Amino acid sequence: MLLGSVPQLDRVAVQLGPFPVYWYGIIIGTGVLLGLWLATREGERLGIPKDTFVDLVLIAVPIAILFARMYYVIFEWEYYAQNPSQIINIRQGGLAIHGGLIGAVVTGILFAKRRGVSFWKLADIAAPSILLGQAIGRWGNFMNQEAHGDEVTRQFLEGLHLPDFIINQMYIDGVYYHPTFLYESLWNFAGVILLLALRKVNLRRGELFFTYLIWYSIGRFFVEGLRTDSLMLGPLRIAQVMSIGLVVISIIFIIVRRKMGQADKRYSEN
């Protein structure tokens, strides 16, 4: 697709009759499948039946999407109150990661209790998978030309040595923008490598998941400061408030669980 003289990628991957299939959905789905593969592989190594994570994903993903959308709509209620028909329209994006994370954690706790397995063990195994899905999912934002930063020049983007297809896709309505999706995606990919390395350290159970929360939140806090489409609560950027909260809560949980003897088991223990 061409916008003026700048070639751009079409957000529609394929047209099936009257139904468009968007890259956003394909990319999100790819992230989920790769994350599932990573989790089931590690789960089997640690004695978790392969179908455990398959069952969890089948339940958690729809609920996470529902929570992600609800979270987004709540903080954009002024718009959706006037356009209620758009509440269920997620083809153009509008899914908040923090909302999805809340939904996934709630589902994971209930699922683990029903299956009689440790939630912390499942959460530790799933942590790299969740971050991998987030890293891949940001490219869905790229295709939708959303979740970008403030205005920049083409020369600035070229100075980052980015390929032309990224630079061109950051050209929106006659203006170039910060590719904040890319910054967060790269930070998350680095986090996946870190978490995979920390598996070998054999941390106490639950602490790999808290490390994920801390790592992701630090990156999200700084990237969010560059974005122009942040969900707001008065003068506050909601994602930054949530990021600070998650870092603090994670550190507190690590300390308290150790002092109370609730983190005696190690990552690889049954």
Swiss-Prot record:
GO terms for molecular function: phosphatidylglycerol-prolipoprotein diacylglyceryl transferase activity. A 1,2-diacyl-sn-glycero-3-phospho-(1'-sn-glycerol) binds at residue 138. One of its GO terms (cellular component) is plasma membrane. It comes from the Bacteria. Pfam families: LGT. The chain crosses the membrane at residues 19-39, 56-76, 92-112, 116-136, 178-198, 206-226, 236-256. Its EC number is 2.5.1.145. Its main location: membrane. InterPro entries: Lgt (IPR001640). Keywords: Cell membrane, Membrane, Transferase, Transmembrane, Transmembrane helix. It is a multi-pass membrane protein. Pathway: Protein modification; lipoprotein biosynthesis (diacylglyceryl transfer). GO terms for biological process: lipoprotein biosynthetic process. Catalyzes the transfer of the diacylglyceryl group from phosphatidylglycerol to the sulfhydryl group of the N-terminal cysteine of a prolipoprotein, the first step in the formation of mature lipoproteins. Belongs to the Lgt family. This is Phosphatidylglycerol--prolipoprotein diacylglyceryl transferase. The lineage of its organism: Bacteria, Bacillati, Bacillota, Bacilli, Bacillales. The gene is lgt.
